[in-house]
Amino acid sequence: MYKPQFMSIPPGTSLAGKTVLITGGNSGLGLEFARQVLVLNASRMIITVRSQAKGDTAIATLRADPEVRATNPNAKLQYFDLDLDDYESGLEFVRKVYADVSVLDILLCNAGTNFFNYETSMSGHERLMQVNCYTHFLVVLSLLPLLRRTAAKRASPTRVTFLSSYSHVHHTLESNPIAAEESVIAHFDNIKKYVSGKRYQDGKLVINAFVQRLASIVPSSEVIINCVCPGIVATDINQNLPLWIKPLMCVFFMIKARPVTEGGRVLVRAAVVVGEESHGRYLQTGEIHSGASFLCQPAGKQFIEKLWAEIVADIGKINPEVKVFD
């Protein structure tokens, strides 16, 4: 995986008056992104958690940070419950946002996990795809009206940024292609098609594909949608891997990983700094990158269209209020 260069944020960058929402903001990159955004004077910060204890700890950590205390001590900090393993939790989260949030300026889809073996989510899909992709897609599509209304109110675009990874170029869809008559979601749900240790890469490819397709129907003047690789950063993303592989990953991260502060800065650049030129694009080292060539090929374009149609249909069963117009 490519290791990004040091990224700086332009002097004078300010998020005063802005509301920022982060999935999985209680640890790792999400927590660091929250900290840096608060230092940029965001007025309201909402993170998602799966337990009250984690939420309380994260808020206390942010409140106690010396830079936050010095620059933005009066910011409104909150946590909302969200279990990405379950579509229904995603829907309840969306309802909570609409009930409590009148404007939304930045949505960072950061939460994620990694599994080595096949597992099934509470919603019945392969678990990594559910957590890293599908429930996030439900949240984004459901919150689009709020993001668009905020953009109209601000007279400037709002933002949606997904956490991606350079590892998506090592996906399995060329060596293990989806048949023309085969459903994309069914392919990923099929345990016989599951390649241990490779689903994380496939998930990031799915994110890149979704970002491209969503950006094709949402004007960048309303919502800037992109995805970004923060590089190799030491976080707890691999906590669910088998015990035998953890020592190997630990050594790898000790050698290759960069500080979480630098990874967080890359996310801030993608979600705050870069402009409409990043709409629908994958960013690496803080700059626009072509990403996996597969998505530019005929088979990749067919994959994008099939994925989009199936995701919209699947999410529509959970939240019929989602309206997507081509």
Where does each model-flagged region fall?
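Rossmann-fold NAD(P)H-dependent dehydrogenase/reductase core
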Residues: 2-233, 325
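C-terminal helical subdomain
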Residues: 250-292, 301-303, 313, 317
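Non-transmembrane alpha-helical segments in soluble domains
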Residues: 211-215, 268, 308, 312
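An acidic site on a long C-lobe helix of protein kinase domains
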Residues: 86, 206, 259-262, 303, ...
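Intracellular terminal tails of multi-pass secondary transporters
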Residues: 1-16, 298-326
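Alpha-helical membrane-targeting segments
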Residues: 1-7, 191-197, 232-262
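C-terminal/domain-terminus segments
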Residues: 227-229, 233, 284-288, 295
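Short aromatic-enriched loop/helix-cap "lid" or pocket-rim segments at secondary-structure transitions
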Residues: 92, 172-176, 237-241, 293-297
